[in-house]
Amino acid sequence: MRLNLLKPALLGAAVGLAALPALAQTKVTNQGITATEIVLGTHQDLSGPIKVWGVPVLNGMQLGVDEVNAKGGIHGRKIKLIAEDSQYDPKKAVLASQKMVEKDKVFAMVGPMGSPTVLASQDVLFDAGVPQLFPLTAAEFTFKFDPKKPQERLKFSNLLPYVESTRAGVKYMVEWKKPKAVCIMYQDDEYGKNVFDGFTQQLNAMKMKAASVTTYKRGASDFSAQAAKMKSDSCDMVLMGTVIRETIGLMAEAKKIGFAPIWLGATPVNVLEIPALGKELVEGLYAIAGFIIPYRDTSTGAVKAWCEAYFKKFGIEPNSQAVIGYNVVMTFAHYAELAGKDLTGQKLLTALESGKEYKDIFGSPPTKFSATNHLATTITQVQQVKNGRWVLVKGDLLF
């Protein structure tokens, strides 16, 4: 893997494209494929506000690359992964994408990080015919595509989507806990708006209305006003469209003023850092989730071996972000292998849309795509922090 810092000056080399059959009229690149390697790109937040996501995701991706390459690669081709630091800045994500497409000649962009950053940069990829595979955002724009816009066929998502997972989680919690005043605080960007959409859609379906709606700007650190408003509005269940520090920050402010609703986090809340940093403050917190978080001291079999390999390589405990990053690479490798020895962009798309399943080692729902569905799964879980660890409350949820 080569990690580069962003540079404003980007080369303007043309990208070689191969036109697909009239079936979709999608342009897809064949660049980045040689007899010995496949060049992949990613942009992560490695030094910005969500680096606690970006760094372990990239670690997991590198572990996957190492594993694939140690086994001889994909039909003899080793993966070369190029990573750029977007710092969770949409403008830097655009520059990173341009650089990787035009200079590094990436075959695909895999696991790019963040709703605002992915949204800002994805057209750079589509215009060049570069597939955007398994981004680290579960926003709807990462998998919903208009058949009349053939370049949108280049996007695939294997994350549990924010809208559908939020609906499933809210439905379960409302039916179980029967709160009287359901409320939400969400980040004012594409991620948060997707969570809000799922929240409102589910309440509408249940003939309910939100008792309080509050937002915050990305990067905010003071949540006293939001906590006070929700307490004033008598909220007894709060959905948080937050990430890590915002989750802990809001719950800390709530504790100061004696506000103790049922707390439910969207999927980005379901990470090890929440109980590690929040400690007793976050005991009892619920979160919507896609898979069981592996703990190195209690895992068994292939998951135990993976945890130990991660710890040996990076010297830190593995987490859910690392699992997702690892799965990005392994899912790509699975479908690139299916595409055959003479790999092309067209053959990769055909393999992805074949309906054939990929099953990871972590017991996640199977990944499967088709020509009309580029979303892997909508099966949801709810987990809770108990004694400092995430434990499963309910699985196999749909709305």
Residue ranges and their predicted role:
Residues V28-Q62, E84-K91, M113-G114, M185-N194, ...:
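Extracytoplasmic "Venus flytrap"
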Residues K105-S212, I262-A287:
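Extracytoplasmic ligand/sensor domains, especially the bilobed periplasmic-binding protein
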Residues E152, M251-Y326, L338, D396-F399:
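Extracellular/periplasmic periplasmic-binding protein-like sensory domains
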Residues A93, S157-A181, D222-S224, T247, ...:
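Hydrophobic alpha-helical segments within soluble ligand-binding/sensing domains
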Residues S115-F126, A228, D236-I257, V328:
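Hydrophobic alpha-helical
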Residues Y310-A322, A333-L392:
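Segments of small-molecule ligand-sensing domains
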Residues T26-V28, E37-V39, V52-N59, E67-K144, ...:
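Beta-alpha junction/loop-to-helix N-cap segments that form part of ligand/metal-binding clefts
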Residues M1-V39, L397-F399:
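Short, low-complexity disordered leader/linker segments with a strong preference
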